[in-house]
Amino acid sequence: MHSTFDFVIVGAGSAGCVLANRLSADGRFSVLLLEAAPQAWRGGNSMHVRNLRCMHDAPQDVLVDAYPEEEFWQDLLKVTGGRTNEALARRVIRDSATCRPWMRRHGVRFQPSLSGALHTARTNAFFMGGGKALVNAYYRSARQLGVQVRYESPVQRIELDDGRFVAAWVGNERIAARSCVLAAGGFESNRDWLRRAWGQNALGEWPADNFLIRGTRFNTGVLLKHLLDDHAADAIGDATQAHMVAIDARAPSYDGGICTRIDCVSLGVVVNREARRFYDEGEDFWPKRYAIWGRLVAQQPGQIGYSIIDAKAVGRFMPPVFDGVQADTLGDLARQLGLDAPTFEATVAAYNAACRPGNFDHTALDDCRTEGLAPAKTHWALPLDTPPYFGYAVRPGITFTYLGLQTDETAAVRFGGQPSPNLFVAGEMMAGNVLGQGYTAGVGMSIGTAFGRIAGTSAAAACGHQHAPQEATDAAA
């Protein structure tokens, strides 16, 4: 079977939907959107998102104060430890300042920062109805614009001619197109690939066996592997780096989403299964540090940790879906969590003794810290001395992986350092160009939205259409 389109988009998450809506805007071209998932699970990881990090030089509707380019860049530089392409990162940052009017035109609605979502009212615009509403809005718009969508249509391979896209294969169907954009996500739901990437630790464990997949089960990386292995596409990123969060250990194996997060880490202590602390819980604001905790827990014995708080923390963070273990004494809490009670009590006693008096303020980098304790807790260090006590078992939860396709400011896939003339990439498949490590809340949506629009413009240009009117509208918005 054979079919031909002007544009084929592989992957129908947020980035793919942005592409589809952009390329179909004037009705001149045929656009096919291929989604691996069934309709009920469409949207990739985008159905689990809740906000977009965006630059703005002055207050805007749901955003307070200002969040200028340089501050956004410094935040990104800090969380990535410098492992980022500055030119591409700044392109994302600048595009984030103009994308919301475009999103609104396609039915996306915004609301102010949620109560309990600390430190994001200035930096992040929240989606009204969450990621599911975002995805549904994009699909409604795509349908109205005449985009063809095929569900349960994973692309296993593509045909190339000297770096030029020719066709994509879905089963036995060959789909030719003048231009193609890849937006098929990472490989986080490919258990075998994760296992190979992470290998064994010093204890003989296979850490990836204990990972939970916070996002979609359909991002298996088949097409990414095909591009890297069979077509020698230029790669970017480390296969062990990912947006990895410490999530409720009771979460499902796949698709737990945002509701599995445990957001009280900075308000207490975190111990491993040996009942010992292993990292500074108060290093920085939670939106800039929540995504390092999955990796930290992955490096602990058994890939499990325990977030511990007392009654003083209740009401200061977004409560998890399921109640934690509760006890009136630390010893009883340890026993319920399966921890050695004397060791746990000694760990908490040492922490309590090291807490220095200060002015507690969870909205600022306060002066409540420990002294003479390793690892230190540098902010929000209050003694755990007010029952009841609460404990939450956490495991590594992967949202998306950072190994992907190297690209440039045109979003072109590159082969041997040369850009393809008609094959482009967007979303998580290229996020490693901006995120070499670490994460900050909402930046994945910034990357997907920005490069969805960039790839759409480049794909149109590859077919001789410059999208000038649309670009002018976006720039003025």
Tell where the protein language model's regions lie, with residue ranges:
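Beta1/beta-strand and adjacent pyrophosphate-binding region of the FAD-binding site
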Residues: 2-15, 32
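Core beta-strand elements of the Rossmann-like FAD/NAD(P) dinucleotide-binding domain
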Residues: 2-5, 169-179, 419-420
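Glycine-rich FAD pyrophosphate-binding loop
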Residues: 24-46
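Conserved N-terminal/central alpha/beta ligand/cofactor-binding core
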Residues: 39-148, 193-196, 270-277, 283, ...
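A glycine-rich dinucleotide-binding beta-alpha-beta segment and adjacent secondary-structure elements
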Residues: 157, 343-437
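Glycine-rich loop(s) and the adjacent beta-strand/alpha-helix scaffold that form part
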Residues: 174-247, 454, 458
